[in-house]
Amino acid sequence: LAGHISWVFGGRNMAEAAEKAKPFKLDGVLEKMKCPYLIINGGADVLGVEGVTAMYDYAVKHGVNVTLRLTTPDETGADHCQHDNPTLGQELMLDWLADIFGIDQSTLAFYPG
């Protein structure tokens, strides 16, 4: 992951990439969001949780309909992008979308519950 991030930002290492990434913020943009916004982040993400919690707090402060879900090591899916359990991330996203659109999943023919 560090190699990829360094490559994306044109850095020779992760420290240089992190420095180049500092200007990339959603301040001044996020409050223009008109649709619900979901943030899923691994609680043990190598990039940390401080950035996403700050983004969440900023969105709430500016009236954005935002949901934050931090995954834990106990449920797996706590790594970056839920690499340790991608199914969990997919389930969280799709359940959230069902809630947003008012879909009662128990009425669906393929619902396993």
Task: Kindly give the residue locations of the regions a language model identified.
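Alpha-helical scaffolding segments of alpha/beta enzyme cores, especially the outer helices
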Residues: 54-57, 95
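Mobile cap/lid helix-loop segments that gate and shape the active-site cleft of serine hydrolases
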Residues: 1-29
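Hydrophobic alpha-helical scaffolding
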Residues: 23, 41-45, 79, 83
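A structural signal for short secondary-structure junctions
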Residues: 30-34, 47-48, 60-63
